[in-house]
Amino acid sequence: MVKKVVMATIACAASGIGFVPAVHAQSSVTLWGLLDAGVSYISNTGGHSAWRLDDGIALPNLLGFRGTEDLGGDTRAVFQLVTQFSLQGNLVAQTSNGSGTGTGLFARNAWVGLDNTQYGKLTLGRQYDFMVDTLFSDVGADMAMYGGGFYGFRDGPFAKLGIPDSPPNEAFDFDRMNGDTPLNNSVKYTSPLLGGFRFGGMYAFGGSAGNFQQNSAQSFGASYSLGSFAFGAAYTDVRYASLLGDSIRNYGLGAKYRGDKLLLTALFTSTRNTQNGAVVNAAEAGALYQFTPTISASLAYTYMWGNGAVDRNHAHQFGSVAKYNLSKRTAVYVQSEYQLTNAGANAAINGTFGPSTGRSQFIGRVGMQTVF
């Protein structure tokens, strides 16, 4: 039941594959989308509490086009174009391996390639790395996937981690699993499923004059599934121009158990800035239970800790979501997130875009989501 009600609805947020019926044709183009909106209360952002109508939290607001063409010999031409937007009518900026952010029409994903049943898939363009593809989409090891969403990804009192293009005073989505940081100019290979095993690798060209490696990136991932269990590992290294030859390195390990009504997840990620030596680790455990076909609830706990370069700050974060499915495509939900840091550090839940002036920060939210 968990697989039917939760996985089919939420997994598309990172993978970019919409919740639509399969199209059995030699050539097809599918339009799909995700929408989320709600009201959130933030206990402390910049010293003040706040109420706000925000969107793209439990799911990002996405509109995508997916196309396939049968070329014969078990080979297909494939493409995907995805844009992210707010319900206020604005495109959402996406960071990348280049300097600054992108607000182009298809800044979330834009790629084309070939997919062969026997040999795998080769794609070129602006794409997710394997922190997203393997740990989030393939294994499903991140509880943010099942309801925590934007507020459930990792952030905290780690501004000294120094990730380029991150919002001021934050280490926004430092382990890259939110999907907001696709890689430009990338070539990616993903193997077919081989006895439960899948692997892949990608390289993103920098292309800066006089410095081939500047703004380049590389990523690798592997996963294995066996019955109700799935496991995965991923690594991504991005050489941002502003780091002057150094990089942000991420790696992660994840696991998931999926039963009839119970789903359990475990995730570990580590992020290093090779320029200043800063390291932040995160360990998360989560559980979701499907009480009825329409009612589910999830809990998540995350512990994040840094080394001396980030003042050895650490943070505990607790998240919960209760969801009621109005249909197979539409749901309403209640969400809470609470973060508590060590003394002298300011809490910063991902997506608040303004840390607390104290050790704690709380978010309560009521929202609605739909997919098409």
Indicate where each model-derived feature is located.
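Transmembrane beta-strands of outer-membrane beta-barrel proteins
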Residues: V29-A37, G73, A77-L81, L122, ...
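Sec/Tat signal peptide C-region and signal peptidase I cleavage site
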Residues: F19-A25
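Detector for outer-membrane/organellar transmembrane beta-barrel domains
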Residues: Q213, A217-N325, Q335-Y338
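Membrane-embedded beta-strand positions in outer-membrane beta-barrel channels/transporters
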Residues: L62-G64, N109-W111, S186-K188, S219, ...
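Outer-membrane beta-barrel proteins
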Residues: I42-G46, Q88-V92, D133-F136, G210-Q213, ...
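Extracellular loop and loop/strand-boundary signature of outer-membrane beta-barrel proteins
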Residues: H48-W51, S96-G98, F174, G206-G207, ...
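Outer-membrane beta-barrel "beta-signal"
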Residues: L326, R359-F372
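Outer membrane beta-barrel
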Residues: Q26-Y41, W51-G206, S223-G227
